[in-house]
């Protein structure tokens, strides 16, 4: 009897420990690096560890980031950008060099716990018009061969992060899911290759995008509160779009003979700015709802149990392309300086812990001069130039700074350029229009940011992408103001 009692206690403790492991290891984050003033990798790694995050997904093999992850115990999925698919598809030797330099070197010498290599990133998006369809599988095969040759096949698995538009359902019921007809054969070849090599299928699912693309999309169905109108699929009840989308993939795999293939959700999250539905309230509601499911070990009707998933993203990226929308720069659960945007429990019961030892530029801002003429013909071109070289995405309709008046809009644009230019005197010399102020011009929830110091700042500011869409909107508002 004593033995049975001890065994029972041991069994319960084992179960509790196992559930703790599920909680800790069940969530990862995407660590993107498209920022003009990025936090030092060591600072970000400390941020990860203090918040109990033990898995990261990288979009490229940044050597500084990988070195910072050395011997931390953090599991890593390292990415290969789409622009490298062609050379890797065309040469086994090129694939072997890439694996040697970006995987083997870090695993053996630096003790980086690389678990996956992500070959490409959403290469079959409809917007790419088939550009990568002929080279993704060959690149995947060559990288796998290189991993085998390096003796890492048992530790490192290949995968291809795909957008959820690679499958569909004519009836919108998950059970009618299958891969898109025009890429179905290609998808089945990739799925078979993944299955043959014990590798996972990685999918990115974004309920926010469903809402962004369709103004008639039922808002409540995007969240996990159970308040959306449910879908009944032959007795399987779906009250949120994530579950329905995920199980559409499960059915697509199952009906083609791959029902047991492991699935990773490579990206899941909600942006906080740049659109009327991208705000702090919705982002917290979505991400906390998702984390509560993970903590409760809740899955979908077809795949019970917590998902293997990576939140998108860790930190805002103010240099990302905004071709998909202004929200693209605002997916982080932390601002660009590593400060939490809202209270979010990742499983420990506590909120997010901010980054430590972050250094900022001086407390000064570039604003519209009080005596500036709002009808000055140089005003429009000056604003356009500032927003072409900085981030003005918070000024759009429904965004955090969307209610500013004309003068405040101009000041925001000037200051954005001034900050990304490291507060150089020359960056606040719009003739007759701008001055430097030591008084914070922030308006309500619209914050006029002070940029962080970064050792890569000068290099980053030299590579700023053009953001004309926001500049055009500002020009239109200026023209309307002048006309009226």
Swiss-Prot record:
Residues 461-484 form a propeptide. One of its GO terms (biological process) is carbohydrate metabolic process. Disulfide bonds join 366-428. InterPro entries: Glyco_hydro_17, Glyco_hydro_17_plant, Glycoside_hydrolase_SF, X8. Contains two additional disulfide bonds. Residues 1-26 form the signal peptide. Keywords: Cell membrane, Disulfide bond, Glycoprotein, Glycosidase, GPI-anchor, Hydrolase, Lipoprotein, Membrane, Plant defense, Signal. Its EC number is 3.2.1.39. It catalyses: Hydrolysis of (1->3)-beta-D-glucosidic linkages in (1->3)-beta-D-glucans. Its main location: membrane. It is a lipid-anchor; GPI-anchor. It is an enzyme of class 3 (hydrolase). Glycans are attached at residues 102, 129, 260, 409. A lipid is attached at residue 460 (GPI-anchor amidated alanine). The keyword Nucleotide-binding does not apply. GO terms for cellular component: plasma membrane; plasmodesma; side of membrane; vacuole. The keyword Transcription does not apply. One of its GO terms (molecular function) is glucan endo-1,3-beta-D-glucosidase activity. SMART domains: X8 (SM00768). It is found in: Cell membrane. The active site is at residues 122, 267. Belongs to the glycosyl hydrolase 17 family. This is Glucan endo-1,3-beta-glucosidase 5.
């Amino acid at each position: 009897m004593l033995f049975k009692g001890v065994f029972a206690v041991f069994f319960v403790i084992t179960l509790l420990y196992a559930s703790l492991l599920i909680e800790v290891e069940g969530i990862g984050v995407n660590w993107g690096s498209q920022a003009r003033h990025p936090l030092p990798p060591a600072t970000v790694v400390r941020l990860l560890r203090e918040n109990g995050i033990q898995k990261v997904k990288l979009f490229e093999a940044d050597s500084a980031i990988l070195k910072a992850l050395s011997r931390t115990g953090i599991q890593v999925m390292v990415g290969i950008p789409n622009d490298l698919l062609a050379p890797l598809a065309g040469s086994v030797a090129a694939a072997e060099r890439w694996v040697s330099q970006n995987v083997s070197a870090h695993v053996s010498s630096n003790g980086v716990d690389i678990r996956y290599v992500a070959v490409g990133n959403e290469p079959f998006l409809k917007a790419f018009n088939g550009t990568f369809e002929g080279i993704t599988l060959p690149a995947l095969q060559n990288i796998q061969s290189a991993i085998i040759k390096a003796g890492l096949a048992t530790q490192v698995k290949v995968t291809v992060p795909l957008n959820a538009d690679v499958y569909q359902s004519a009836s919108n019921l998950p059970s009618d899911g299958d891969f898109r007809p025009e890429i179905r054969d290609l998808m089945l070849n990739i799925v078979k290759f993944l299955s043959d090599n014990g590798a996972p299928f990685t999918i990115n699912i974004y309920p926010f995008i469903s809402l962004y693309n369709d103004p008639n999309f039922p808002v409540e169905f995007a969240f996990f509160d159970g308040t959306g109108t449910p879908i009944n699929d032959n007795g399987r009840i779906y009250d949120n779009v994530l579950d329905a989308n995920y199980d559409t993939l499960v059915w697509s795999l199952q009906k083609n003979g791959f029902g047991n293939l492991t699935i990773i959700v490579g990206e899941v999250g909600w942006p906080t700015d740049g659109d009327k539905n991208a705000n702090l309230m919705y982002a917290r509601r979505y991400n906390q709802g998702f984390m509560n499911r993970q903590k409760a070990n809740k899955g979908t009707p077809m795949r019970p149990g917590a998902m293997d998933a990576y939140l998108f993203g860790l930190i805002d990226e103010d240099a990302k392309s905004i071709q998909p929308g202004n929200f693209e720069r605002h997916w982080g659960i932390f601002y660009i300086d590593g400060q939490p945007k809202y209270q979010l429990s990742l499983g420990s019961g506590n909120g997010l812990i901010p980054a430590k030892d972050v250094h900022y530029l001086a407390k000064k801002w570039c604003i519209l001069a009080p005596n500036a003429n709002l009808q000055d013909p140089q005003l429009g071109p000056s604003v356009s130039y500032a927003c072409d070289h900085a981030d003005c995405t918070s000024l759009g309709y429904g965004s955090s700074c969307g209610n500013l008046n004309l003068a405040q809009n101009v000041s925001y644009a000037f200051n954005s350029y001034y900050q990304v230019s490291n507060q150089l005197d020359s960056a606040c010399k719009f003739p007759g229009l701008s001055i430097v102020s030591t008084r914070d011009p922030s308006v309500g929830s619209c914050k006029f940011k002070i940029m962080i110091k970064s050792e890569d700042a000068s290099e980053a500011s030299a590579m700023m992408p053009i953001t004309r869409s926001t500049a055009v909107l500002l020009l239109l508002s200026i023209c309307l103001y002048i006309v009226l």
